């Protein structure tokens, strides 16, 4: 038997949303599975019509993390400008990231926000949880998170493999 396979890009959404409604109020439930390229844009697009909701539940349970930049952008959606999101300390590079209001509009800044975490919430998910809690923007509910608190980068090697290196904490 011979097969001819065609390789295609598979787009996996990192954000799921749906509304929880009662006769008195509507709350949007948002699950972020991981922080990959465009997670913040995907979240913003899905929450674009929040005028009719009374609150948001942001579920980061079992979220292993992902891209630091996307964690910063997701946090930025819910924080007014000049609020500290994260600062990293590395042996080579240290940096500070404050909210910049990267996306137009402020409808997400005043909506009540509850954040869910558990022991499976790590890395970028912990950064979002800490930023929103420390800036008194969200109530965090759940278990202690994984406790990773590190920033890693992936280096592509010539043989097609990769090396994941911790570059900050």
Name each model-derived stretch.
Residues 154-155, 165-169:
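Extracytoplasmic/periplasmic membrane-proximal domains and adjacent transmembrane bundles
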Residues 1-158:
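Cleft-lining beta-strand/loop regions that shape enzyme active-site pockets
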């Amino acid at each position: 038997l011979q097969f001819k396979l065609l390789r295609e890009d598979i787009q996996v959404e990192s954000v799921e949303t749906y509304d929880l409604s009662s006769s008195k109020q509507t709350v949007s439930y948002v699950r972020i599975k991981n922080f990959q390229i465009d997670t913040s844009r995907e979240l913003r697009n899905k929450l674009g019509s929040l005028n009719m909701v009374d609150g948001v539940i942001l579920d980061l349970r079992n979220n292993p993390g992902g891209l630091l930049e996307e964690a910063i952008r997701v946090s930025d959606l819910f924080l007014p400008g000049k609020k500290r999101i994260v600062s990293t300390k590395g042996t080579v590079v240290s940096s500070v990231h404050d909210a910049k209001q990267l996306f137009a509009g402020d409808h997400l800044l005043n909506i009540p926000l509850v954040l869910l975490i558990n022991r499976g919430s790590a890395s970028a998910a912990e950064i979002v949880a800490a930023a929103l809690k420390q800036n008194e923007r969200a109530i965090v509910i759940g278990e202690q998170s994984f406790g990773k608190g590190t920033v890693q980068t992936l280096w592509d090697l010539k043989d097609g493999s990769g090396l994941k290196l911790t570059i900050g904490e």
